[in-house]
């Protein structure tokens, strides 16, 4: 089963994303801090990480840098920060993709599919889920 880890300091966001992904048959886990997220990446070896940038303690940029020291897991940034400088700095820190909240669920799923295809994984979420027009809030 396809494993996705969401790391965001907002429990409502991680719960919403986890529910959205689980209702589509995916193995979704969550962490509400960068430190806990790194521990989970080591423990469960997710296929994709969805990561917020602005978090207390270890922020998303720091998480990207740390994860890149031990893993090539695709990292999708999902944040409210929309300036070109933020996008560039996240990609420079090791992120693979960047989306700005709010995002339609279909767009999120399409980006997850692209990341798995680029990673060359044998798993595909394309056939596991249906896409609808729901939009994830900020």
Where are these regions (language model features)?
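C-terminal output helix
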Residues: 85, 102-116
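Receiver (REC) domain active-site loop signature in two-component systems and cognate sites
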Residues: 55
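Short, Lys/Arg-enriched segments at the junction into DNA-binding effector domains
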Residues: 3, 116-138
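Conserved acidic segment of CheY-like receiver
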Residues: 1-12, 17-21, 49
């Amino acid at each position: 089963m396809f494993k996705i880890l969401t790391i965001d300091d907002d429990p409502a966001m991680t719960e919403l994303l986890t529910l959205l992904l689980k209702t589509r048959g995916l193995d979704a886990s969550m962490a509400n801090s960068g430190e806990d997220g790194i521990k989970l990446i080591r423990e469960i070896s997710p296929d994709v990480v969805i990561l917020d940038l602005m978090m207390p303690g270890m922020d998303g940029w720091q998480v990207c840098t740390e994860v890149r020291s031990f893993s090539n897991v695709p990292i999708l940034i999902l944040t409210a920060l929309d300036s070109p400088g933020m996008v560039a700095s996240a990609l420079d820190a090791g992120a693979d993709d960047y989306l700005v909240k709010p995002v339609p669920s279909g767009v999120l799923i399409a980006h997850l599919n692209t990341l798995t295809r680029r990673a060359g994984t044998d798993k595909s979420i394309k056939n596991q889920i249906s896409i609808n027009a729901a939009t994830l809030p900020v």
